Amino acid sequence: MRPDDPSLLRDTEARVLAWCEQAGLFAHGQRVAAAVSGGADSMALLRILLALAGRLEVEVSACHVNHKLRGAAADADEAFVRGECARLGVPLQVCRAGEDGLPLAGGGEAGARALRYACFERVHAGGIDRIATAHTVTD
């Protein structure tokens, strides 16, 4: 089966739907934000959540954290996420390190994690019930 085979996507959606229902991850009407970096794993998560939103009975949005650690590359990731969310019609909240009271992402992984958690807390306080994250097998 090729990665772009539509049956692969349907199979993946079916597995995710079954897992979400079995685990009781979402309640009717909940607002779910996909945490998206712009990478393949998180963008796939966003697309799958959008495809399943009706069956899961959830409202889907996205959030993105710009850690500002990689200069122009971080800004390019943010621009990509903004563009994709606009194209898909997905509400997006962007958190940027050192802005709007958010911490800087210094201090390596611990600092980056602290920034992500601060962003997720802000998103949750804004009315989002669940934040979904995606990781590849090698993460």
Give residue spans per PLM region.
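Core alpha/beta nucleotide-donor-binding catalytic domains of modification enzymes
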Residues: 1-139
